[in-house]
Amino acid sequence: MYNRYQQMNSAYLNLEDLIKEAGLTIPSGLCSSSSASENPFPEPIQYVCAPARKLKFMLVGTHAHQTTGYSKVTYHIIQELAKHRDEFEVFHFGFQKFMAQPTDYRNYPPGIDVHDPVEVEKSGAAPKEMGFGFSQLPAYVRKVKPDVMLIYNDAGVICQFLDKLSSELSASERNYKLIIYLDQVYEIQRPQFLARIDQDAHSYFAFTMYWKQVLQKQGIKKPIHVLRHGFDPTQFKPMDRGAARKKHGIPENLFIFLNLNRNTPRKRHDIVVQAFAHLVARNPTKPLALLEVCDGGEGGGYPIQEIYMRTLESLNVPIQHHAHKLMISKQSLTYTDELINELYVLSDVGITAADGEGFGLCQFEAMGIGIPQVVPLIGGFRDFCTPDNSQLVVPKYRSYLALGSSSIGGIAELVDPFDLSIAAENYVMDSDLRTRHGEAARRTVLGYEWSKEVGNLIRVLRDVAKE
């Protein structure tokens, strides 16, 4: 019995000799084995392979401590990638961190390397570039040497980053695979922007399938994937409406329309307040209110209060009886996610008249807690707003944008204020419809899970790692 075992053991120990006799080879450096022992009962041979190198992934996008929609998306992308730290090293070139946040606000996971261009600009060590840090990116690339870089923004900003990289880095220093996560808000992109981006891009991500098709129609032949925004039900969730209204001093019987968009030209607050004036004119005795969570035009946007008053006057409505129904909150960029959740909860309906929309995160989040929306049938809204969960308003006008007012150009799709007011009125007059659409809206948005959406990016990164 002992001799038989010894023969078996000897054959086992001479495995490499047997392989050589068979004319096979073992790749050098791939594996190493433990040496043979004089012990007639040695330990099993252990082959120890070098661990696979992690893929270095660099995200160039808004800092997670900003309060914009961009920042929410970058935050959740990083959170999901951090769950795969055995595969990826994650680096974030996080621009436009203009404000300090509480220590518990959107903390980065351990092990994430974050570069803050704003901090460097403030120190005087780099030129001031609106917090984007275009001039700082090449040095960060040299430091990190990423395998894959993803740039997330609109075409104009992306082109500025690409120009800076190509002018300051050699071809060998730009041997990363470049993925473009393109924010499209209008149906056309300026051809020179697309040509510049496509020159360097390895592949693309679009916000929705609709935007993927729009990009393909403009001649992009490289792979285009879809990375929709996700919804975090632990961050935005239903609360007691009565308690929220009491906290903010809002009467329980008030019917509130909420617009949480910034007062920028694209968001068309002028159309929203005109529509609300039409609604008030037709329903003067109803306790209606429009809460505009933005500045009143002091920052260069629409003079909301003035437009509302003039529209009431043009409709022969006594201004003094209805001026108070427009409520303007002027601190939209400093609101935390917790406070935004309360604003969603205390509202009855959300409303917007944006003439272009990449995704529509404000409407999306409100729908996630059961607040139905009145929206134009455009862009990103097409993905999650349907006749079964929203009031959709078909745009009546299309207008090319002057480059002096919009550097990215495009065709704006404009709804008529009167049409928007009719859609809003449907919810005022039909509480059952409002409830039904709110429930359907929540079901729809709960299906957008960050883990699933970012999973599309992870699959692409794994494929790139195999190339």
Locations of regions flagged by a protein language model:
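A short helix/loop element that forms part of the nucleotide-sugar donor recognition site in Leloir-type
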Residues: 42, 237-250
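Carbohydrate-associated surface elements
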Residues: 210, 230
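Conserved donor-binding/catalytic core segment of Leloir-type glycosyltransferases
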Residues: 58-59, 251-267, 273-276, 290-292
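Nucleotide-activated donor-binding/catalytic signature segment of Leloir-type glycosyltransferases, i.e.
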Residues: 302-342
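A charged, aromatic-enriched C-terminal amphipathic alpha-helix characteristic of glycosyltransferases
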Residues: 415, 419, 429-459
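C-terminal alpha-helical cap of glycosyltransferases
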Residues: 8, 15, 23, 44-45, ...
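Aromatic "clamp/platform" in nucleotide-sugar-dependent glycosyltransferases that forms part
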Residues: 355
